[in-house]
Amino acid sequence: MSSDGSAGKAVVEAKGLNPGLIVLLVIGGLLVTFLIANYVMYMYAQKNLPPRKKKPLSKKKLKREKLKQGVPVPGE
């Protein structure tokens, strides 16, 4: 009797992969593909896009910075 039970388990295991494992492999594969694609696009952008321009400082901020440094602001 015990030999029949173990043979039945062997047949079930030989049927195929666990569906949960297949789902994990698919999700893992998609995640790895996504990360690799992001890295490739990042490297492409670093080579081909011009560097970002700094935002222009407003007159108010320029005045404040000059006051901090002790430089007299013209017009005052």
UniProtKB/Swiss-Prot annotation:
GO BP terms: regulation of DNA-templated transcription
Keyword Transcription: yes
Primary location class: nucleus
Localization of this protein: Nucleus
MF terms (GO), sorted A to Z: DNA binding
Nuclear localization signal (motif): residue ranges: 50-55
Stretch forming the signal peptide: none
Pfam families: S1FA
Keyword Iron-sulfur assigned: no
InterPro entries: S1FA_DNA-bd
Disordered: annotated segments: 51-76
Bias (Basic residues): 51-66
Role: DNA-binding protein that specifically recognizes a negative element (S1F) within the RPS1 promoter.
Family to which this protein belongs: Belongs to the S1FA transcription factor family.
Name the record gives this protein: DNA-binding protein S1FA2
Organism of provenance: Arabidopsis thaliana
